[in-house]
Amino acid sequence: EFMRRIFIATVSLFLLFNAGAQSILQRPKLVVGLMVDQMRWDYLYRYYDRFAPNGGFRRMLNNGFSCENTLIPYTPTYTGCGHSSVYTGSVPAINGIAGNTWWDKEKMRTVYCAEDNTVNTVGSKSSLGKMSPRNMLSSTIGDELKIATNFRSKVVGIAIKDRGGILPAGHSADAAYWYDNTVGDWISSDYYMKELPAWVSEFNSRKMVNRYY
């Protein structure tokens, strides 16, 4: 009888912890990181009435969690620093992105935060694709997600400007895309791929930019 009770108690504990582990291990299938240049957190509340009733901003406010006291003390407040600091959780002195551009005393010239002369443009013949995250010294949320899932996760960065797509996505991103304003197409670099995926090429072929300019 005593052994039977121990067995039942052991099985009960196993089922309890197993159920708890299953609930903890439930993960979202999609995580979206969004940065809006020069948008302070209080704008979400100030302009709440102007957001679409079923739009994304109201959904985030009504169903999300607001970290209003979060602060990363860094300077200068350029976008390269901002993207890197938010997605690495570190400051420029640690992540290496000290501005959109800075003076490199070893190269004796000004360098751009995402420049990389060892890679080539994919998607156009311009030099605007010679970019990568190699100047960034820290890992990003995307990099840590890759490690945590044994590189089964897919991480993609997309932005109008190259630094906005490249730096947040991190070193191990599957892809990063940005806009080439010399040809009106979305491009990448061979740091990520040898050629654009079919869906990007198809989107470029629509020349949607011609509708606005």
Spans of features found by a protein language model:
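Short, structured active-site-proximal loop/turn typified by the sulfatase FGly-forming signature C/S-X-P-X-R
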Residues: 44-94, 154-158
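Stable alpha-helical elements in mature extracytoplasmic
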Residues: 35, 40, 53-57, 82-83, ...
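His/Asp/Glu-rich, glycine-adjacent segments
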Residues: 91, 96-213
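Extracytoplasmic/secreted cell-surface and envelope-processing proteins
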Residues: 41-45, 79, 165-169
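Soluble non-cytosolic domains of exported or imported proteins
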Residues: 26, 38, 47-51, 77, ...
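Bacterial Sec-dependent N-terminal signal peptides
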Residues: 1-26
